A protein has these predicted regions:
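C-terminal alpha-helical cap/extension of soluble enzyme domains
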Residues: 155-219
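Catalytic alpha/beta core domains of metabolic enzymes, predominantly
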Residues: 80-179
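Electropositive phosphate-/nucleotide-binding environments in soluble metabolic enzymes
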Residues: 19, 23-26, 47, 71, ...
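Conserved structured catalytic cores and adjacent interaction surfaces
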Residues: 53
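Catalytic beta/alpha-barrel core
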Residues: 5, 19-21, 38-50, 59-71, ...
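Glycine-rich, proline-tolerant flexible connector loops at the mouths of alpha/beta enzymes
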Residues: 5-24, 180-191
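Alpha-helix-loop-beta-strand connector modules within alpha/beta enzyme cores
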Residues: 18-42, 76-83, 132-147, 192-215
């Protein structure tokens, strides 16, 4: 595990769902990551939060699916030197996603990581459809890293391993995976979180797949 991700501010479909712990949570998150010797990534929802993010030395800023076309937000992070994970909007085309990245790059920040997190289709059995095809397309169209979020794509913990394997086989450079020591007690996204033991097992499987393809994802 290279980086710790957590949401101090949580964009939720319902205003009555848990919205995160705010700036206090960001401080606790920073402290926990420092104790573990890990950098942090967290989602930026509002340009008014940016100063606090910089004060807490957020290592990587995440632009979530709902903010992919928040152009003022994209312009602001484009002025920084902080790496940005740009998640695909749930109904966004590849072209729209690429143009969102251009908003960031046009400000001078080329430290952009694309994250495929599933798109909305007519299917209702699972949350979203992980667009594995997007991985080789982005690899062809850009020189930038591409990662996937199998947790939000399927929305269920039992889907995470299969989607992760598909993503690595298709050429993804990394994963964003929800993990919790006791998923049933998680305040949000409990259904899609896997345990630390399951994550360790998954990483061994993914390393084996990558090795077959002549890649090393262990570094």
């Amino acid at each position: 595990v290279k980086i710790m991700r957590g949401g101090a501010f949580k964009p939720r479909t319902s205003p009555y769902s848990f919205q995160g712990t705010g700036f206090e949570g960001l401080e606790m998150f920073r402290e926990a990551a420092d104790n573990a010797g890990l950098p942090i990534v967290t989602e930026l929802l509002d340009v008014r939060h940016l100063d606090k993010f910089l004060e807490q030395k957020v290592d990587v800023i995440q632009i979530g699916t709902r903010s992919m076309q928040n152009f003022e937000l994209l312009r602001e992070v484009g002025r920084l030197k902080v790496p940005v994970i740009l998640k695909r909007g749930m109904s966004a085309t590849i072209s729209e996603w690429l143009m969102a990245a251009e908003y960031i790059a046009s400000g001078g920040n080329h430290n952009i990581i694309f994250c495929e997190r599933g798109i909305r289709t007519f299917e209702t059995y699972y949350r979203n459809v992980l667009d594995v095809t997007a991985i080789p397309v982005l690899k062809k169209e850009t020189h930038l890293p591409v990662i996937i979020d199998p947790s939000h794509a399927g929305g269920k913990a039992w889907m995470v391993a299969a989607l992760s394997r598909a993503g690595i086989a298709a050429g993804a450079d990394g994963l964003l995976v929800e993990m919790h020591p006791t998923p049933s007690e998680a305040w949000c996204d409990a259904d899609q979180a896997i345990t630390p033991t399951e994550l360790q097992k998954l990483m061994k499987e993914l390393s084996a797949i990558a090795n077959i393809l002549g890649r090393d994802i262990s570094k």
